[in-house]
Amino acid sequence: MQYSTFAAIDIGSYDVILEIFEISKKRGIRSVDKICHRMELGKDTYTLGKIRPEMEEELCRVLADFVRIMEGYRVDDYRATASSAISEASNSLYVLGKIHQLTGLSVTVLSNSEQRFLSYKALAAMEDNFNKIIEKGTAILDLDGGSFQISLFDKDALVTTQNIRMGSLRVRERLAGIQSETEHYEEMVEELIWNEVSSFKKMYLKDRKIENIMLIGDVFTDSVYQNIEEKTTKIISRENFNTWYEKIIRQSPMELAVKLGIPLENASLMYPSAVIYKCLIDMMEAEHVWIPGVHMTRGIAYEYAEQMKLLKGGHNFENDILMAAKNIGKRYAVNRPHVQNLEMTALAMFDATKKMHGMKERERLLLQMAVMLHDVGKYISFNNVADSSYNIIMSNEIIGLSHIEREMVALIAKYNTAVLPSYDELVMESSLSAEQYLTVSELTAIVRLANALDRSHLQKIQSIRAVLKERELHLSLTVDRDFTLEQGLCQDCLLYTSPS
């Protein structure tokens, strides 16, 4: 049986993890070995704003050991990732350079949306349970040291996702100086996070019924399960979760460490983690809590298997990305019929000109998102739509997109109505590469032309046939009323093309 050996490394807020996987079409993703080294990088970053030299040296030693383990397993490929503990450190570039110099590892720093997306892919690796559960109102609560993410699913589609920077390690360090002054530490944690939690409830829950909650995080041990059935299914009742919670908050970290056989540092994080989870579960009033016990490293392996076509996933993650954009558009009252008409014409032109522009499915997805969000700025200002649209898109997290991809979508929306500056001008305030700039310019041209073809917002085009003939794009349109306005205005649009 053919299989690929893959290594996933996660540099987290309070631990560094290496997991070795065997991936095959027949057996799927199978974990072979997992090594976890405890070190609180996040403590340095969240309190000092940087990673101390001694912590950096320890990290490099651990990663060098991981490299030797990977060599022992003869891994075919690897991916190393880091999140907020590295990205928020003022000396992050130096630390990443040192890691590469001493270990040879190239570490990818994930944006929050990319990190959470991998966590969802870890859940999808257990796809039978995952797809079944999210058919009904479901919330995924993903807690780590730096923040927690709340994502709502309904009818197998992502409704919304929001990040709140109140992770277990960040909360613990923030309250460390005043913890000894109270006998009710849990009440302080509740008060600290309640404003954000209640705001989320007002904005996104309203009359929505949440039947299931999935908890992602390393805080749980088998102590959370009250019987064999729960341990087997990984699903517990809300009542039994509350029983576990009461046991946790009544014991000191030292007592927890001894009783549960875990490091003292882990025990100290169980307090804020348990309180955060309890607040969210009470707010949503869900009766069933699923604790799958998966780690992001499995999500990294899942994504690798998808990219290498070793596995075909059962859940449509691209649809989740599009649903996130659709719901942002809904929140900012976009003209949905106009957007749907624009999407039809823009995608037809993109597909017809593939041989000319050479872009792939990922760029097509970015085009769809730009179309969905190109007019969100009207919610703030009709006279400054371009800048308003850009700011709204950049301020909203879109699960599954990297920061640079979100910026590309925002720029396409902005320059749909404004003049696109030269690359030399744009790069002064943007992190786009020259290649990404060309992608933005080409997709912007498509959106401009498609937008001009529905300038009246009356959806006159009923169907479109786009054909590329000798570097000329020919559009055959079926319209249901006079098209003079659109014909005149589309003459002003220039379609950028790449050189042959």
Which stretches of residues belong to each language-model region?
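Conserved small/polar residues in nucleotide/adenosyl-binding loops
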Residues: Y496-S500
